[in-house]
Amino acid sequence: MVGGGGKRRPGGEGPQCEKTTDVKKSKFCEADVSSDLRKEVENHYKLSLPEDFYHFWKFCEELDPEKPSDSLSASLGLQLVGPYDILAGKHKTKKKSTGLNFNLHWRFYYDPPEFQTIIIGDNKTQYHMGYFRDSPDEFPVYVGINEAKKNCIIVPNGDNVFAAVKLFLTKKLREITDKKKINLLKNIDEKLTEAARELGYSLEQRTVKMKQRDKKVVTKTFHGAGLVVPVDKNDVGYRELPETDADLKRICKTIVEAASDEERLKAFAPIQEMMTFVQFANDECDYGMGLELGMDLFCYGSHYFHKVAGQLLPLAYNLLKRNLFAEIIEEHLANRSQENIDQLAA
């Protein structure tokens, strides 16, 4: 069911509130955000959000009760966006909020459907953080970072938003020399570290849970975040592309740089051949192959590949029963833009 709550795996991943050594006694602590507001966020996005999303909002409310979304802008240059806009009630001030497309709200040029932006940073590089989930009916596997003006690479930065912001803050502290600014950041760092500790969130860049996911990744793809698709004991679910990543990038480069349409058509031949292989793979339930080729072409970024990516990706997502991702990629390819990604902007 799309939008249904992904089940938490047992194993004490959830934050624990009570400071106690007896694990049985420690209770999972929910953030103080009303169920109506939670429903509103999840209905707009058709995705379940993890508890750290709501806990971080409460943390930012403590920093700035008036404008939690901007509580980190002066100090870190970070702003809470995306689903946080709903918690802030920004969608209600927008006149045409009914026609708002949250599938595209803060969806940057290279963001695959698996990526959901929650925090933005430096506009010059289009730095942003987002939850990365392998399937729409699961909770995120980590918080990823991308700088859309630079490339399509997604860098995993912890499995919760506290970790992602802490890692960002630590890097920032190493870069600045202004004493006043250093003290301000250290103050936020202490508060954030304490809040994460009390709630039981890991501040590691790569947690055990993330390393376990790494083992399930069938292929890295151009964005580096990797694809996870179900593969059964007979190895049905994924088959490799006949070209290496380096070769595929070379093929893409030749297509994009072709001097004429005729040359471009010729250069497309290896892609056409791979699409035939994908059809065979789909017939034999190796749906991961089409997902990989489509994702690589999407990540390459050129509009010359939009049509092919638009054929491969929605089909792959639907075959994998990740229907919401199929919907997102179709809408994104139809409105793929390097600017104008804030759907709430006037």
From Swiss-Prot:
InterPro entries: HPF1 (IPR019361)
Primary location recorded for the protein, binned into one broad class: nucleus
Outcome when changing residue 303 to Q: Does not affect serine ADP-ribosylation of histones
Alphabetically ordered keywords of this record: Acetylation, ADP-ribosylation, Chromosome, DNA damage, DNA repair, Nucleus
Location of N-acetylmethionine modifications: 1
Modified residues (N6-acetyllysine): 19, 186, 233
Domain of life: Eukaryota
Residue positions, PTM PolyADP-ribosyl glutamic acid: 240
Disulphide bridges, residue numbers: none
GO molecular function annotations of the record: chromatin binding; histone binding; poly-ADP-D-ribose binding; protein ADP-ribosyltransferase-substrate adaptor activity
PolyADP-ribosyl aspartic acid, modified sites: 235
A UniProt-annotated Pfam family: HPF1
Active site: 284 (proton donor)
Region (Disordered): 1-23
Reported impact of residue 285 to H: Promotes auto-ADP-ribosylation of PARP1
GO CC, alphabetical: chromatin; nucleus; site of DNA damage
Function of the protein: Cofactor for serine ADP-ribosylation that confers serine specificity on PARP1 and PARP2 and plays a key role in DNA damage response. Initiates the repair of double-strand DNA breaks: recruited to DNA damage sites by PARP1 and PARP2 and switches the amino acid specificity of PARP1 and PARP2 from aspartate or glutamate to serine residues, licensing serine ADP-ribosylation of target proteins. Serine ADP-ribosylation of target proteins, such as histones, promotes decompaction of chromatin and the recruitment of repair factors leading to the reparation of DNA strand breaks.
Protein name: Histone PARylation factor 1
Source lineage: Eukaryota, Metazoa, Chordata, Craniata, Vertebrata
Gene symbol of the encoding locus: HPF1
